[in-house]
Design a protein with these regions (language model features):
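Class I S-adenosyl-L-methionine-dependent methyltransferase catalytic core
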Residues: 1-154
């Protein structure tokens, strides 16, 4: 595992167990480095075999950066540049009316985390106050979006 934007590995376990991730997979918010879902042979994008098929990332929280990145990822799925993308965001993120367009096809669903991720080593002593979810856009998904829940362990 090279890195991930949270020290809480349960976030990665949850999406890996709850969704099939097309390979290779990268994290665009961290210099295109492979995610710890299934990292590249030597841990660098240039070492990956073939173009990325999916993007899994924790986008920056600040506007307009977050929406710019997410809309580009969704467009990449819609245009079949990648098969799927997923973003790790707070549970209320998808309630903003300005983001309504994001939740048309190929929006596939969410994975609600049944734990609150820790972001820093010092935070393990205190319980974080925000709940998080993975939002998934996937061209392979058929039917209505699904809601899944995962505890980050099983």
């Amino acid at each position: 595992m090279d890195h991930y934007p949270t020290i809480d590995d349960r976030c990665v376990v949850a999406i890996n167990k709850a969704w099939h991730i097309p390979l290779p997979c990268i994290d665009v918010c961290h210099d295109g480095s492979p995610t710890p879902l299934r990292p590249a042979v030597n841990g660098y994008l240039r070492d990956m075999l073939g173009a990325p098929k999916s993007v899994i990332t924790n986008p920056p929280y600040k506007l307009p950066d977050c929406d710019r990145i997410v809309s580009q990822l969704i467009d990449a799925v819609r245009d079949n540049v990648i098969e799927m993308c997923a973003i790790l965001v707070r549970v209320q993120w998808d309630n903003a009316k300005g983001r309504a367009e994001y939740f048309k096809r190929p929006f596939a669903g969410s994975i609600q985390l049944q734990f609150r991720p820790t972001w820093f080593v010092d935070e393990k002593k205190a319980a974080p106050i925000h709940s998080f979810q993975w939002l998934v856009w996937d061209n392979r998904h058929k039917g209505e979006p699904v809601v899944r829940y995962h505890n980050g362990v099983e």
